[in-house]
Amino acid sequence: RLMYWQVYLHKTVLSAEKPGEGNMNFTLRIKTNLRSFILKQSRGYVEKYPQVAAPENRAMMEAAFYDIIQDSATLSAKMPKLIGKDAVNNILMLEDLGEGSDFARLYKQGDTIDANALEEIIDFAATLHNAFDAKNFDNPIRNLEMRKLNHEHMFIYPYLKENGLNLDEILPGLRAVAAPFKQNELLKSKVAAMGVLYLADGDTLLHGDYFPGSWLQTNQGIRI
């Protein structure tokens, strides 16, 4: 695989390494004698949990997202540039944003985010939500298969009495805390109604993975 890219680029590949801990896709940082870039491949399963099936072409949905946001200088400046794509093998070639840290630290008790960073993150989501209307596109991104996967894990799986997940391994005592929520039928009916909305086609463009792990603090500022 490295030899293929070396011939294709007419450059010397110096190294290939994982840029971080990802869940969904197989990702590499490729360093050459001239630059570095990111390769991301989506396969027919969740990379971190191979037993979980996932839409194989999800990287191409992501590529379509990158193409659309190029019409917004504000949004495209906050995200890596899409350099190229291989639709046959579901591979994206992306700009390398460099070494940085994400905001997953916010899940730790006592950790915070400063007001300016929070405003940037909120502004990005608000701009994205208002900048595009599906009615203006011949083929708007629907990505229904990926939404079905997320729907199962957000609106169904957590509320099953026995879902095979040992919550106490995540945090001691969490199983007992979660039990009342799993037994609350009113809550579950409200969650189910939200799930129906989630699966419905809307008119706005959404980022499908907008959470602290996708917010990066880099030398160029916050990137998504």
Show the residue positions of the predicted features:
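Short helix-terminating capping/connector loops at secondary-structure junctions
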Residues: 8-10, 74-78, 199-200
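Structural motif corresponding to the C-terminal cap of alpha-helices
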Residues: 3, 73, 195-198
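Active-site catalytic-loop/activation-segment of kinase and kinase-like phosphoryl-transfer enzymes
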Residues: 141-194
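Short, conserved clusters of charged catalytic residues that mark active-site
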Residues: 11, 22, 61, 77, ...
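Short flexible/disordered coil segments
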Residues: 99, 137-161, 196-217
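Juxta-kinase regulatory segment immediately upstream of eukaryotic protein kinase catalytic domains
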Residues: 1-16
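Active-site acidic catalytic loop and adjacent metal/ATP-binding pocket
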Residues: 17-32, 38-39, 189-224
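ATP-binding pocket architecture of kinase catalytic cores
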Residues: 19, 29-140
